[in-house]
Amino acid sequence: MTISKDIPIRVDKEILSGAAVFEGTRVPVSALLDNLEVGVSLDEFIENFPTVTREQAVRVLEHFKSTLNDIKLAA
């Protein structure tokens, strides 16, 4: 299942037991967040996970930011 055409996230029970991954890869989206949390730059993440494009990573982060803004507005 693709989350949205605009968001490059895929969830498929056959891929990493259904973990959210970057579309077209087996890289979990959580890997991006985990790496950023410990101080890895976006450039380093892309270098370490070459199947994920910069555009994909940025679009996912923008989606999360938008979702947080929506939650804030709803509160």
Give the ranges of each region predicted by the language model.
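Long, charge-rich, low-complexity alpha-helical segments
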Residues: P28-A75
